[in-house]
From Swiss-Prot:
Zn(2+) 2 binds at residues 108, 141, 351. The active site is at 78, 140. Its main location: cytoplasm. This is Acetylornithine deacetylase. Zn(2+) 1 binds at residues 76, 108, 165. Its cofactor is Zn(2+); Co(2+); glutathione. GO terms for biological process: L-arginine biosynthetic process. Belongs to the peptidase M20A family. ArgE subfamily. Catalyzes the hydrolysis of the amide bond of N(2)-acetylated L-amino acids. Cleaves the acetyl group from N-acetyl-L-ornithine to form L-ornithine, an intermediate in L-arginine biosynthesis pathway, and a branchpoint in the synthesis of polyamines.
């Protein structure tokens, strides 16, 4: 049987739409792309299991080899939506131009599975001593559903994991988490000619925002990690809306904010700090404040700095590991084994019109993955 080429696999991935979104009109599921991945890896000799996590949402686990431990290569199979008017190319067609692959998912990150596929074909597997696993997850771009489900129900425990997000082939050993909430203040509307007729939600929100800015200062003062370019947690007040007319007492005001906690800050601890910051406002205005999560919180992540896995991958890549401020599935997979984030392409291309991957990454990525497979499986 003739196996598909690297280019054919890449084209097949990009042409198979797998958008995930919190907007139901965009959300598609990933069944079709998982079906293709399962078929390709079966043809390579992997045993493959497809798990339906939710209707239309699937994970794929492929395994080559027997025994314990081994290496897990992981990534998400979904993409973000796209703004067609801002693209110069068809997002669902792999376009080659100016030594680049253009298309939705070329860098972030369906294309990574084509690199795994090609690297596997170059290995002499007769010398294999430990298993190689490939994990393709669902809904990374929205809820991290696939990674959460896999971690909670993992059928094996690898020695190490590499997640192929676009890092320009620089190993990433840590990143901040992400917590995003809405604070809704419910007042009582009324005619502005008599303030006593109502309770102004904007005025209460003013007190909330003062408390949140005090919390921001506390986070900066109490937490510091020298391994990050921005060494403290960040708290951003990102969106606010309240009221509907200048001559009405505002009956409702809502503030959206996010926090990017450092590794080591527990989500429960952060929640307690938030509640503590708002305690006085809530006591003054009982029943008028509500905190609503905008998505499931993601903790910070860090692979132990002196772990041999970091040194081994740094040697393969011939570059030092770093930390970043964006989020991946690493906090969940790190619960199973030491995990690094390492993949082709630049994070600057993620979620952008005319997303692309430079041809300069093709041979080095296949080489890095091949060497990792040999080092940790053979």
């Amino acid at each position: 049987m003739q196996l598909p080429s690297f280019l054919e696999v890449y084209e097949g991935l990009i042409s198979t739409s797998s958008i995930s979104s919190t907007d139901p009109s965009w959300d598609q599921g990933n069944a079709k792309v998982i079906e293709k991945l399962a078929s390709w890896f079966k043809d390579l000799g992997f045993s493959v299991e497809v798990i339906e996590v939710e209707p239309g949402k699937h994970n794929m686990i492929a395994r080559m080899g027997e025994g314990e431990g081994g290496l897990l290569l992981a990534g998400h199979s979904d993409t973000v939506p796209f703004d067609e008017g801002r693209w110069s190319f068809d997002p669902h067609k792999l376009t080659e131009k100016d030594n680049r692959f253009y298309g939705l998912g070329t860098a972030d990150m369906k294309g990574f599975f084509a690199f795994i596929y090609e690297a596997v074909k170059k290995i002499d597997w007769s010398k294999q001593t430990k298993p190689l696993y490939v994990l393709a997850t669902c809904d990374e771009e929205t809820t991290m559903l696939g990674a959460r489900h896999f971690t909670e129900n993992a059928p094996f425990k690898p020695d190490y994991c590499i997640i192929g997000e676009p890092t320009s082939l620089v190993p990433i050993r840590g990143h901040k988490g992400h917590v995003a909430n809405a604070i809704r203040v419910t007042g009582k509307s009324g005619h502005s000619s008599d303030p006593a007729l109502g309770v102004n939600a904007i005025e209460i929100m003013h007190e909330v925002m003062f408390a949140m800015m005090q919390l921001r200062d506390k986070l900066v003062k109490e937490y510091h990690h020298p391994g990050f370019a921005i060494p403290s947690p960040t708290l951003n007040l990102g969106h606010i809306h309240g009221g509907d007319s200048a001559n009405r007492i505002c009956g409702c005001c809502e503030l959206h904010y996010d926090v990017r906690p450092l590794p080591g800050i527990s989500l429960d601890g952060l929640e307690n700090m938030l509640r503590g910051a708002l305690k006085e406002v809530e006591a003054k205005w009982p029943g008028r404040l509500e905190i609503i999560p905008l998505h499931d919180p993601i903790p910070g992540y860090e692979c132990q700095h002196d772990h041999p896995f970091i040194g081994g991958v740094e040697e393969i890549c011939q570059t030092s590991s770093e930390t970043v401020n964006y989020c991946t599935e690493a906090p969940f997979l790190q619960q199973l084994c030491p995990t690094l984030v390492l993949g082709p392409g630049s994070i600057d291309q993620a979620h952008q019109p005319d997303e692309f991957l430079s041809f300069d990454f093709i041979d080095p990525t296949i080489d890095v993955l091949s060497r990792a497979m040999v080092k940790y499986c053979c």
